[in-house]
Amino acid sequence: MALEMRAPLEFWSLMPAMPALMRAPRGDGHPVIVFPGLSASDGSTLPMRGYLQAIGYDVSGWNQGYNFGPRAGILQTAVRQVRDTFDSAGEKVSLIGWSLGGIYARELAKELPDCVRCVITMGTPFSGSHRSTNAWRLYELTSGHDIEKVKDSFDLPKAPPVPTTSVYSRSDGVVAWPASLQNAQSNNPHTENVEVIASHIGLGMNPAVWWVLADRLAQQPSQWKPFSSPSGLPRLLYPDPSRR
């Protein structure tokens, strides 16, 4: 958890990085919904959503207050939000989820593939043991759910049937990074893992992560290609996820 102490530095690094971030691929106006992490609310994703709005997306939060897990009605309300957004916009919705919010984004895309354009998760533990996250006790306390029963209720490791990007950090102080790795699957060749240098708490305020979001959202699903570090940026920002 000591690794999380650097999160304020990630936030303060946004200001000097903004000129470069504003040169990221521009949005086409399609709708984006952002889901916060455990015990967090839309306030935690406000800077990120403001940036995505500024580069050309129609961005909204999940509008359900603090995220205390999939309590009664939570996922049903999220399903309605995705459907209503799709119907009102007349085009598919991109879903972004931070930590636990990424579980929602992935499962919603599995349930509503005709409504979802792409999924991007940040520090989301969907693979392996869910006790690989330091927050599992907090999850059980706040949600009232046994984490293993939740795991058994969903096929979490299975990739959604839409372009899916998992952003993770090997120095994540909350989630063990292997739990955020999407294995190659025959049901969806358009999946990838993108490694960044970030704390878990700082993922949503990290310039390298924001660039990944902009790059992935701008990509047309029919022309999907794996993320490639932009030329001119230090390779250190995006280490090779295949390295040992």
Regions found by a protein language model. Name each.
Residues 1-33, 45, 50, 55, ...:
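Flexible, membrane-associating and regulatory peripheral segments of lipid-active enzymes
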Residues 11-17, 84, 88, 141-144, ...:
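A structural signal for alpha-helix termini and helix-coil/disorder junctions
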Residues 13, 74, 205, 209:
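Soluble or luminal CAZymes and related metallo-dependent hydrolases
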Residues 30-43, 47, 51-62, 67-162, ...:
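Serine-dependent carboxylesterase/thioesterase catalytic core
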Residues 110-111, 116-244:
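Helical cap/lid subdomain of alpha/beta-hydrolase-fold lipid enzymes
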